[in-house]
Swiss-Prot record:
Catalytic activity, EC: 3.5.1.n3
Gene3D superfamilies: Glycoside hydrolase/deacetylase (3.20.20.370)
TM stretches of this protein: none
Function: Catalyzes the deformylation of 4-deoxy-4-formamido-L-arabinose-phosphoundecaprenol to 4-amino-4-deoxy-L-arabinose-phosphoundecaprenol. The modified arabinose is attached to lipid A and is required for resistance to polymyxin and cationic antimicrobial peptides.
GO terms of molecular function: hydrolase activity, acting on carbon-nitrogen (but not peptide) bonds, in linear amides
Keyword Lipid biosynthesis: yes
Root EC class: hydrolase
Protein name as it appears in the record: Probable 4-deoxy-4-formamido-L-arabinose-phosphoundecaprenol deformylase ArnD
Family membership noted in the UniProt record: Belongs to the polysaccharide deacetylase family. ArnD deformylase subfamily.
The UniProt record lists the keyword Hydrolase: yes
Amino acid sequence: MTKVGLRIDVDTLRGTREGVPRLLATLHRHGVQASFFFSVGPDNMGRHLWRLIRPRFLWKMLRSNAASLYGWDILLAGTAWPGKNIGNANAGIIRETATYHETGLHAWDHHAWQTHSGHWSIRQLEEDIARGITALEAIIGKPVTCSAAAGWRADGRVVRAKEPFNLRYNSDCRGTTLFRPLLMPGQTGTPQIPVTLPTWDEVIGPAVQAQSFNTWIISRMLQNKGTPVYTIHAEVEGIVHQPLFEDLLVRARDAGITFCPLGELLPTSPESLPLGQIVRGHIPGREGWLGCQQAASAS
């Protein structure tokens, strides 16, 4: 049996309102639990449209047929009008999710984090994280114990900025296996659970066709040599491609794969995890930099 951590990112108002309820129903039908990470502040995701001037981002949008995939309400959110507050508008849905699934913070403002966190000060990072955690805790009525950086925009500064919040783990980067981030000699931070597998929008195109994606990703899960962690998005697998995701759950079960919340991947003694660090890097299919796992001994 292969255990795969299932991470569900919720980036937008529509993803929360429409995608999450469908995902909750789908997961319930198949007896699967996952980790949901919510954006709880303003939905300004439409402001990413200016990135269309970047060839790699434009190619990604064309390759994934973004207008059909996400819908124009997502692609234009926060452009011609102020972004609506996701948490306030969908508190009941988020609260229901937290009743049945591990629930953590994705971002206060997903667009702001993805666009500006790379040059924010530690204080600005801490203030933004605190704002999101405070809002999410007010909604779910219990402490937030985990987080996942929006767009995997994380580096050593983000690791340090999250330390005051006493989280059980973070999932801020791409990598191969769980690790303890090295803060300074002799001091380590909150365990990291990297995402190890590609997302739908990173691979769909000439190399992998939509109809063969499930076969392809299951093969990758079974071949994964580290600790497999897979990310889906409420805006994609919860709406347009919900039938495809349900088919994935069936095929994965038949292939001997069991999905679980990320927290279940943590060992009893996190001190046994190897040391590592998060550095800025790039991966195929994703525009811009993102946090990548690196061995602590690497220069």
